[in-house]
Amino acid sequence: MRKPDSVAALTEFGRVRLSKSFFMRDFLFSDIAAVHGLSNVPDDPDLAIAAGSRLCEELLEPLQDRFGRIAIRSAFRSCEVNGLGNEMQAAGRGGYNCASNEANFAGHIWDRRDAQ
């Protein structure tokens, strides 16, 4: 899948089902992106879908089955969004809590593999 570059493509990407209860759109909101006018979409949608599916199927669905409905507000960060958050945090700006991009690969940044 190509990186969404239009409203229609982003809408379609957001409708990708990651598990029985979760869709990609559940994970894409970012306060940092909203405030700074940034796009919070993955450069590698296929890798992000694979990572998100594992998160949902292996962790979130079992938690939800045990404790009830889980509402996700945000989980994915693009490199651009995470990088800005890290810069703002390093500059002492309040409200930003982002590790470096490299430390967040395969963490918040789903479309990059970690070193392992």
Language model features with spans:
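Cell-envelope/glycan interface and biosynthesis
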Residues: 27-116
